[in-house]
Swiss-Prot record:
Quaternary organization: Homodimer.
DNA-binding region: 33-79
Result for mutant: residue 133 to D: Transcription repression by ModE even in the absence of molybdate
PROSITE patterns with a match to the protein in the record: MOP (PS51866)
Domain of life: Bacteria
Protein name per UniProt: DNA-binding transcriptional dual regulator ModE
Effect of residue 125 to I: Transcription repression by ModE even in the absence of molybdate
Compartment(s): Cytoplasm
UniProt-listed SUPFAM superfamilies: MOP-like, Winged helix' DNA-binding domain
Known regulation of activity: The ModE dimer binds two molecules of molybdate (MoO4(2-)) with a Kd of 0.8 uM, which results in major changes in the conformation of the DNA-binding domain and confers high-affinity DNA-binding to the transcription factor. Additionally molybdate binding moves the 2 Mop domains closer together, trapping the ligand between them. Can also bind tungstate. Molybdate is bound at the dimer interface using residues from each monomer.
GO MF entries: cis-regulatory region sequence-specific DNA binding; molybdenum ion binding
Membership in a protein family: Belongs to the ModE family.
Gene from which this protein is expressed: modE
Length: 262
């Protein structure tokens, strides 16, 4: 759904940038002239000059400087800061539109989570399995550490291995919201619980679909919370697997990748 979302930026409780002013800056950049830029933007020269003057006064850096020449007289040039403001404004406008699109595209997405929202409309990875969770515990060994993650369903817990350096850099302390990434080839599927118990993590579920290839099989598994887990296993390990079976997915702590907002 394409919505008209008008972005307004204020500094010191005064208007700094809006669609009209950004349009003016873009036309000045193209024409090299305040008067021509104002004409192309559909506003008067006085209004254009007043807007530029106010933006220059509010900002820590000058946005528009006088220059010789320019189409239509009144030569002007955008500073690097002015150019970056346009880029930032356009980027924020895109983010707003993508955030609004989430309302119609994904009804299940929690909108009270900044990490969930950002990852939904800006983060794309090759990992088929992605879950949101919260750090509940972390040991502090010297080199390799382990964190416990409670997933968004409030029941499922996973153990994840990290380096001590990564734990400190990402601030992976208790209460930190994280995104769990798990690639399909790193997941095993079995009906034998004893086999699954040898791994750090086990997730029970029901096989919902199997795509059999020449060398690999893609197994989709419905988890108790309604989410789908994807695993790719060698053909010889999938001969006994059938749709509708109760199985256990298993994987080790060092197969999991953690992403978060710092």
């Amino acid at each position: 759904m394409q919505a008209e979302i008008l972005l307004t930026l204020k500094l010191q409780q005064k208007l700094f940038a809006d669609p009209r002013r950004i349009s003016l800056l873009k036309h000045i950049a193209l024409s090299g002239s305040i008067s021509q830029g104002a004409k192309d933007a559909g506003i008067s020269y006085k209004s254009a000059w007043d807007a530029i003057n106010e933006m220059n006064q509010l900002s820590e850096h000058i946005l528009v400087e006088r220059a010789t020449g320019g189409k239509g007289g009144g030569g002007a040039v955008l500073t690097r800061y002015g150019q970056r403001l346009i880029q930032l404004y356009d980027l924020l406008a895109q983010i707003q539109q993508k955030a609004f699109d989430v309302l119609s595209d994904d009804d299940a997405l929690p909108l009270n989570s900044l990490l969930a929202a950002i990852s939904r409309f800006s983060l794309q990875t090759s990992a088929r399995n992605q879950w949101f969770g919260t750090i509940t515990a972390r040991d502090h060994d010297d080199v390799q550490q382990h964190v416990d993650v409670l997933l968004a369903d409030g029941k499922t817990r996973l153990k994840v291995a990290i380096t001590a350096q990564s734990g400190a850099r990402l601030g992976l302390d208790e209460g930190k919201e994280v995104l769990i990434l798990l690639k399909a080839p790193w997941v095993g599927i079995t009906q034998d619980e004893a086999v699954a118990q040898n791994a750090d993590n086990q997730l029970p579920g029901i096989i919902s679909h199997i795509e059999r290839g020449a060398e690999q099989c893609e197994v989709l598994m419905a988890l108790p919370d309604g989410q789908t887990l994807c695993a790719t296993v060698p053909v010889n390990e999938a001969t006994s697997l059938q749709q509708g079976q109760n199985v256990t997915a298993y994987f080790n702590a060092d197969s999991v990748i953690i992403a978060t907002l710092c």
